[in-house]
From Swiss-Prot:
Protein name per its UniProtKB record: Required for respiratory growth protein 7, mitochondrial
Classification via Pfam families: RRG7
Subcellular locations according to the entry: Mitochondrion
Keywords: Mitochondrion
Keyword hit for RNA-binding: no
Superkingdom in the source lineage: Eukaryota
InterPro entries: RRG7 (IPR018828)
Family: Belongs to the RRG7 family.
Species assigned in the record: Zygosaccharomyces rouxii (strain ATCC 2623 / CBS 732 / NBRC 1130 / NCYC 568 / NRRL Y-229)
GO cellular component, one term: mitochondrion
Amino acid sequence: MSRLKAINGIMLRPIIWKRPSSNDAILQFIRQNQEISQSSVFQGTLYEHTVMRELSGKLSMNQLQKIGGSHDRGVDIRGQWPLDFVFGQVTKVVPLDAVPKRCKIHGTTLKPLRCKIEENDGKLDPLKALVQCKAFSGSKVSPREFRELVGTFASIVPDSQRNRSVILMCSPNLLTKEGLSLINTVKVPLIYLRIEMLQRIGDNYDVDNSGRLLNYYENDYAAALLQGCGIKEWLKLSLYRR
């Protein structure tokens, strides 16, 4: 018998996430937790599962683990991002512009990861991905929450590994002007993903046509680090469908 997990006093039935790119895990979670389906805990956890599906299916992230809890330090999901795979697939279809060997962003000099991929015969160790989910449909992410996210990154990732990790904020809402201005000043690779919440159809959820990745935005630091890796081409051309 599976053990129940309590969050804020509400019991959630855990699931084993085997194939994040499919809807199986989402449907299993919904089915096993019908009795609390009106709670905010259920909605938040459902959104995390939806985000995992999109990270795997649209951005080719893998080894995704949902870790949210009292000791998560603000991180809901961890995983790995094999950018060399994305780069390799994109360059089979379209040419990518050359990138500089070094670039300077906000007073920090860095080497674009594209250069490392080319220097290592198309190989690169996967980036560590730290993901925070904000499953609220009525309010946009505030600058304070972005500052807290940057603090989370700094507390988990040592300076020596800053360019080997990315932190992602996922929300159903568009960025505010204040939030956009703030994230473009920070010296960490931060990506904002606008991912829909699943929509209800009667008593069921439309897992096939909702919960989609709508917007992908890199802050200035991430844009410098990830330039030329083909991520935007990968998304624009829907190469993840192959």
